[in-house]
Amino acid sequence: MQLCTKAYCLFVNEEAEQNEWLLALVKNKKGQYHSKVAFQEFFDVKARNYFAKPYGEKFKPNTVTIAQGFHGKVEWQGNYSLNLEGDFGPDFRQIVSWRNNIPIFSGQAIDLWLEYKKSEDVHIVLVATQFQQGTLDAFQQRWEFNDEELKNVCVLDNQMGDGPVFFSLLAKGKGSLSIISLHDRHSRRGLGTFLPGGDRYVTSDREEIFCYFDPGDCKPPLNVYFSGYKTMEGFEGYNLMRNMGGPFLLVSESRMEGGNFYMGSEEYETMLKNAILKYIHELGFTEEDVIFSGLSMGTYGALYYGCDIRPHAIVLGKPLASIGDVAANERIHRPGGFPTSLDVLNYVTGGIRPEHVETLNKRFWDKFDATDWNHTKFIISYMIEDDYDMTAYNTLISHLSSDGVQVYGKGIHGRHNDNTGAIVGWFSGQYEKLLLDDFHRVVEKPQKD
């Protein structure tokens, strides 16, 4: 039961005989007790929300169409946002629409989250219009969400037939409106974001952080994995971390095109740090009972928040540290390879000039150099000809001046994305060795069918 049951998916009859084994299982799996009557309700109503494959995406700013009647100022901030300024009129009227529709099936629910910023005198309404399947204009139903409702996740709960949904935004008033991203995710109707039990945190600027915590067997270490760059929203590394056998925490974000390297406002970064500490303390662990890890963009999160937590070890694959350099390399060394880096540079520093590159690099290295790493191991696999952050490994080594710090590294020939398989293979092998040597954990290989 411990191995085959997933967290948040264990349901026990409240009349079952209580013993030490069952109590431990319910605790470790975040299980729930139900009466016989509640079980019937669960099967009738809630079971459908435990579907296997989560899904989330966002509409990019370049899929937005501006209404012909708007004559104000229009500005595109890369792939980050569309900024409008002017007089939207005294009454609500359509200001923008999104060119791509999304499907929604009968009985399905979709969570919507609109990232935006606006002047106080500007008011908006998000409109979702569903058409009948197989038709171009046969109206089926319509949802509207005003300013107050948009403060929370909005849900399209479809109790009618299948059909595509078209989105538009109405506005009135005078001032500025920045449309950043419209996110749509398959909803579990309050039972978790992306995965059952998935936690969502949001700042006053509407920026999100996602965490999925599995207590495992509640024995050290807690394995924390930061998701890398991805355009499909959700968590990364679930099977990898679950196969380690112990408690694990997945961290993810959905800003920019595929992530913002976990950097943000003071509120954002404090929220993420406190979320990690909350799960550590829930287990009764200390920072020395924690391992941070990540691949590519996820390595920055592991290093950046590693400065705050100072875990027992940090396991990295394809490390990225000088994000200013990553953006600068887009011009000559990697043209068109990772344009999101330019959006990140502009978002964090307010520009894309050489001085902004240096400012972004300094943001990381000042924090890294101020940290005492004397109790932390670094296990790093890197690409020798990396075209994102060419000097990440060597620069990390040169900045690790704390007494007692241990570094294990392996270089693999190729550019950043040339041999991810070899990187992941060494990453997981060293992770398993770390668990065995330092925590006496043996990772059992999953059975093959």
How would you describe each model-predicted region?
Residues 245-258:
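Conserved alpha/beta-hydrolase
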Residues 219-228:
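Short beta-strand element of the alpha/beta-hydrolase
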Residues 334-410, 416-420, 424-446:
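The feature captures the conserved acid-bearing segment of alpha/beta-hydrolase catalytic domains
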Residues 262-285:
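Alpha/beta-hydrolase active-site loop
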Residues 284-296:
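Alpha/beta-hydrolase fold nucleophile elbow
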Residues 294-306:
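Glycine-rich nucleophile elbow surrounding the catalytic serine of serine-hydrolase chemistry
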Residues 307-349:
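Hydrolase active-site cap/lid region
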Residues 53-195:
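Beta-strand-enriched, solvent-exposed domains that form extended recognition/catalytic surfaces
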